Amino acid sequence: AVGDYKKLSNEVGGMNTALPEEVADKMKALLTEYNAKEEKTFEDILDFHVKFERIHPFQNGNGRVGRLIMFKECLKYNIVPFIIEDNLKLSYYRGLKEWDNEKGYLTDTCLTAQDKYKEYLDYFRIAY
């Protein structure tokens, strides 16, 4: 059912994800770790996202849910949010894959997306 943790193994961008029987414990650990941080930075939000995507807790829709969580967390912590548009998808997936070795790929991709979002805010004269 929608919202239930996955029952079958799945993958993202060629990466293995948590086994269905590991999901509940891994999600609990991830949320405990993340919520222990009082103020979240841009990097904290990206790090949470990478870990969430590696768990891939749901059968489908994990990417959308994960990116929506990033958007919400940016708003919550007064960080300009961003949307990963199609032209950034390949860089985004590379960033997810390379996060442990090189945080710059995902960080730069998300900062590029954030710059685009700032253009929209500027156009509508919305302060940030």
Model features per residue range: what roles?
Residues A1-Y128:
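FIC/Doc superfamily catalytic core
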